[in-house]
From Swiss-Prot:
Source domain of life: Eukaryota
Entry binding sites for Ca(2+) 3: D173, D175, D177, R179, E184
Protein name listed in UniProt: Probable calcium-binding protein CML24
Organism: Oryza sativa subsp. japonica (Rice)
Domain EF-hand: 35-70, 122-157, 160-195
InterPro entries: EF-hand-dom_pair, EF_Hand_1_Ca_BS, EF_hand_dom, EF_hand_pair_protein_CML-like
Gene this chain is encoded by: CML24
Pfam name, any one: EF-hand_6
UniProt keyword annotations, A-Z: Calcium, Metal-binding, Repeat
Ranges of Low complexity composition bias in the record: 1-11
Keyword Nucleus tagged: no
Amino acid sequence: MEGEQQQQQQQSVAAVRPSLGKAPSPSFRLRNGSLNAVRLRRVFDLFDRNGDGEITVDELAQALDALGLEADRAGLAATVGAHVPDGAAGLRFEDFESLHRALGDALFGSLDVPEDGGGGGGGDEEMKEAFKVFDVDGDGFISASELQEVLKKLGMPEAGSLANVREMICNVDRDSDGRVDFGEFKCMMQGITVFGA
């Protein structure tokens, strides 16, 4: 029975990649080294919109949509369903952890990051792509209101107060102009990668 369930989970995970409406941005890769249990729990809590301790297919689809990863509902239902225990309405945290481990490269591509940065400056291209997600108006800077808008889309509680968002900006704003330029963003992201690993 357990071997059959594992095979079903593997097949459903393999079906996810073609069900995505577009290829996931490399900027949103889940990197095993930097996504520990505490961070995964925070992601789970964000995706669990109604706070009932389970993530339904609808809640997961809404979260993926907010990240720009439109997924086919049928494929998503099959993948999630393979990890939902009998009698449960959705993924509990331990099921979500199992799904996260199973998805690995199937959904987000290779998780290996070459030590030289990927050759040809690919790391900078990924960083620029991530920066563009936050630089909503395309002016080359991330303002507090732009950051707040993205945080709202992601359902993050930090988005509730513009003063808190401004404080977040101040923490990385080296030239004190009240906004984050690409260099400041890059330093911040490299710090997250180093300290989060």
